[in-house]
């Protein structure tokens, strides 16, 4: 099975080896071929998204499914919330059973904050976590991607 995954940028693409490793340990003999399709900052919208999905599903080497992964914070006001983003992507693509829109409630990079101690070790810095009890609170005003970028720029 081939699954094309539309992603917004370099962080998401860099995540794929770890995702493949995680899935291969759990999908014994049923591991799909994950094909990341990377864009610069946000995946296409409206008619362009529909054309891309159609091409991926019916091209020379067609995918069996297409997953679109987007953030709420795309640098625009295209989406008001996660449900709005999923609904709009589904509407733009149309009635395609093997298209699966998925939305990171905040930045994709926020998913990385779960491993804050490991991030600090990798950056070789000591810094307390930039949120209180709820990591989602840090999105407003300064997204996780910017915080992570600053952390690695100020390293040792």
Question: Which residues make up each language-model segment?
Answer:
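Extended, compositionally biased accessory segments flanking or bridging domains
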Residues: 7-9
């Amino acid at each position: 099975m081939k699954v094309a995954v539309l992603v917004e940028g370099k962080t998401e693409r860099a995540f794929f080896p770890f995702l493949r490793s995680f899935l291969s340990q759990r999908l014994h003999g049923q591991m799909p071929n994950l094909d990341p399709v990377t864009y610069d900052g946000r995946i296409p919208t409206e008619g362009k998204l529909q054309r891309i999905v159609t091409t991926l599903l019916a091209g020379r080497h067609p995918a069996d499914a297409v997953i679109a992964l987007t953030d709420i914070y795309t640098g625009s006001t295209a989406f008001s919330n996660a449900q709005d983003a999923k609904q709009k992507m589904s509407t733009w693509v149309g009635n395609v059973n093997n298209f699966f829109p998925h939305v990171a409630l905040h930045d994709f990079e926020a998913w990385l904050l779960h491993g804050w101690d490991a991030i600090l070790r990798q950056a070789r810095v000591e810094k307390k976590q930039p949120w209180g009890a709820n990591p989602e609170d840090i999105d407003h005003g300064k997204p996780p991607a910017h915080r992570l970028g600053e952390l690695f720029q100020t390293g040792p």
